[in-house]
Amino acid sequence: MSLSRHDIRKIAFQTLFALGSNPDANSEDIYQELLDEDNNDSDLSYLNELVDGVLDHQSEIDMEITKYLRKNWNIGRLNKTDLIILRIAIFEIKYSDVASKIAVNEAVELAKEFSDDKSYKFVNAILQNLI
């Protein structure tokens, strides 16, 4: 069964959250817990692209986020959920062929799903300034 891109982004978010909480964790083990056995290779390929891409470009992505934070704010003050959602969106905007508007919309939807009511507005504001 093929997953939607939104579902793949949700799994990427959950994987990155788990890896951030436990650096010794293995992304493949997390995938096995989150994915059905009958997912196709293109799903796994895009999931790997997102997770590995965010991890590989994390320092550059974090520098982008920092540019749009208020004075006296740093990346460490951000809610972990919002930070991971921003990292996924910025990876898609900067390093993949996903249209910026789609990446922003998907990030806002993830924030609505996984964070509080104010977070989606914050995520949207940061990403709108970036694009």
From Swiss-Prot:
<dbReference type="GO" id="GO:0003723">
    <property type="term" value="F:RNA binding"/>
</dbReference>
<dbReference type="GO" id="GO:0031564">
    <property type="term" value="P:transcription antitermination"/>
</dbReference>
<comment type="function">
    <text>Involved in transcription antitermination. Required for transcription of ribosomal RNA (rRNA) genes. Binds specifically to the boxA antiterminator sequence of the ribosomal RNA (rrn) operons.</text>
</comment>
<protein>
    <recommendedName>
        <fullName>Transcription antitermination protein NusB</fullName>
    </recommendedName>
</protein>
<keyword id="KW-0889">Transcription antitermination</keyword>
<keyword id="KW-0804">Transcription</keyword>
<dbReference type="InterPro" id="IPR011605">
    <property type="entry name" value="NusB_fam"/>
</dbReference>
<dbReference type="InterPro" id="IPR035926">
    <property type="entry name" value="NusB-like_sf"/>
</dbReference>
<dbReference type="Pfam" id="PF01029">
    <property type="entry name" value="NusB"/>
</dbReference>
<keyword id="KW-0805">Transcription regulation</keyword>
<keyword id="KW-0694">RNA-binding</keyword>
<comment type="similarity">
    <text>Belongs to the NusB family.</text>
</comment>
<dbReference type="GO" id="GO:0006353">
    <property type="term" value="P:DNA-templated transcription termination"/>
</dbReference>
<dbReference type="InterPro" id="IPR006027">
    <property type="entry name" value="NusB_RsmB_TIM44"/>
</dbReference>
<dbReference type="GO" id="GO:0005829">
    <property type="term" value="C:cytosol"/>
</dbReference>
